Structure formats: structure tokens, C-alpha cells
Amino acid sequence: MKALAKLKKQPGIWMINDAPIPEYGYNDVLIKIKKTAICGTDLHIYNWDKWSQNTIPVPMITGHEFAGEVVAKGDGVTSVDIGDRVSGEGHLVCGQCRNCRAGKRHLCRKTIGIGVNVQGAFAEYLVMPAVNVFKIPDSISDDIASTFDPMGNAIHTALSFNLTGEDVLITGAGPIGLMAVKIARFCGARRIVITDINEYRLQMARDFGATVALNVAPFKNQDELVKQMRKVMSDIGMTEGFDVGLEMSGINSAISMMLDVMNHGGKLSLLGISAGDISVDWGAILFKGLTLKGIYGREMFETWYLMTSMLQAGMDMNPIITHRLHIDEFQKGFEIMKSGQCGKVILDWSS
């Protein structure tokens, strides 16, 4: 089968045409891939950064955001049928630890990821345990379903706390941050402010309903950044701090600024992964009585039910997809992702 694989311990990704179709077991399904989306993680693997060098076995078929069709299944599978349109949870868990047995599978200590630790979805076929497979409702397109993984991250982060009637600050306007703007607006947030240094994506955020999309590139230090944020708050009628913070960047200055402008009793969801250690004002957390929640992946499968229900209720995520390419143009897709001048990039695996 055709697949995209990390074949060398250097930057790049390579097309192969003779990868074996994976074998499925008693409780597995075989999925024919229709669409995949390129994730920031895939870009890290492409660039072969320090995290990738320490994590990714080579050779490895990568990718974990997908939509496809069930074409075969093991004898023990009763939850899906051949012909079902599906996506799937890319975190594979042990099912036996305390958290798994308590229904908190997203907190499994033994989690491994498709396209990271085991064969991924950048291939014509993918094998996955049936318990990880999620049926796609007829009203949701394959393109949108292929973005369920990052959308689930955005849903989990944004809906960890109530957003209705609240003032929300989002730091980081990557695709997940942009999805969070859509989610917060759909859920009735009062004011939504988002920060980034990428003007293309900040304009997308404005189009998605952000009250203010602030380019923080011009500000030379933390004091200037906080001063400008307080001016923004004043300009939009905020007399107190933000009620909810959604941290999507992993950038020290963004987190420090967020802590500075949160209201007393504010709540923060932290999804962004830092490249190194982060220094925070512990006093701001204590004396403001802030609540912090770390986010990893999606709740299985509450997050999936929430996002499909919201999409079916009218939340429009289609504009997050800015580029659609055939799989043979995968190099162009990765170059577009590297440029940052995009939302989600979808790869079509049809013949």
C-alpha cells in the first residue's frame, strides 16, 4: 500500500508504495483511509526536532488525524460494521490501570499514540482497536471528521469550564486556538480575545468571531505586553480580568501575561506544550484563587460526543480548512503548514 513514512533520521518525510497492509486481530478493524489532516505533531516529526529524535522510531508510518471506511473487522467486533464511515481516537490505552478502569482513559499512564509509537494514518489502510473507532454521523463530512483529533483537543480545553457569559482569553492562534474561538462563540462567551504573532491566523480568528485578535509581535517585554492587553480590555469595556483562560501556545510570556490579566477566581485550561521549563508568578495563582487544569488529548469518548453534537447543532468548523490537496502533493502540504499561512491542510487519499 501507499504510505508516508519517516524513513531517515533527518528532516523530511517520504512516500513509499510497497508498505504491507497491516494485519488486524480479533478485536480490531481495518480502515481504508479517505482523508487525513496534517497536525503540528506531524510537522515536528517532519522537521526532526529534539522531541522527535527522542520519541519517534525509524522507520515509522506517521499521521493520526483521519477519516475512512471500515473494510474488514475481527470476529470479536460488534460495535461497527463493514462500510461504516469512521474516525478514531489516536491515543491507545491499556484498559487495566486505575484511571482506565474508572472511566478516565485519557489519563492512562501507559498511553501510546498512532503515528507516534505505532503505525499511523498516513497510509491507505490503518488497523485500530474497535474500542477506539468512532462512527461519523451522516451529516458530518469526511474533511471535518479528519480534524476530529485537534477539534477534540479544542473542545476538551474550552469546555473544561463554563464559557457562557464569560470573558475568555486565548493565547495561541494555531488551528486548535482558532477552533477554540469558534467553540467559545458558539457557547455564548461574552468577549473573546486571542493573541498570536501570525497575522494570517489572527485574521482568521477575527472572521471566526473573536472580539479582538491581538498581534503581540511588536511588544519587546512583558511589561509592554501586559500594558497593551490592559488597554485592549479597557477598549472593549472590561473593568475586571478574564474569567476563563485557554492557553494554547506553551510560550512563557503568554502564560505570564495570562496570569496577570485573569480575574480573581479565574479558571485556566492549559494545552500548549512548552519547549522547556516555564517560570510563573506563583503569587498570582494563590492570591487570585486561580484554578488551573492541564489538558492532554480528549476525554474518551465524552469529548467526541460533545463535538459531534455541537457540529450537528450548527457549529460551523468548515472555515478552519484552508487547503485541500491530493496525497501526491503531500510535500506542498507540509510546506504550507511550515509557512503558517493556513488553517488545517487536508490530504485526499482517493485514487
Swiss-Prot record:
Homotetramer. Its EC number is 1.1.1.103. The active site is at T41 (charge relay system), H44 (charge relay system). It holds the Pfam family ADH_zinc_N. One of its GO terms (cellular component) is cytoplasm. This is L-threonine 3-dehydrogenase. Pathway: Amino-acid degradation; L-threonine degradation via oxydo-reductase pathway; glycine from L-threonine: step 1/2. The gene is tdh. Its cofactor is Zn(2+). Keywords: Cytoplasm, Metal-binding, NAD, Oxidoreductase, Zinc. It comes from Francisella tularensis subsp. holarctica (strain LVS). Catalyzes the NAD(+)-dependent oxidation of L-threonine to 2-amino-3-ketobutyrate. Transmembrane segments: none annotated.
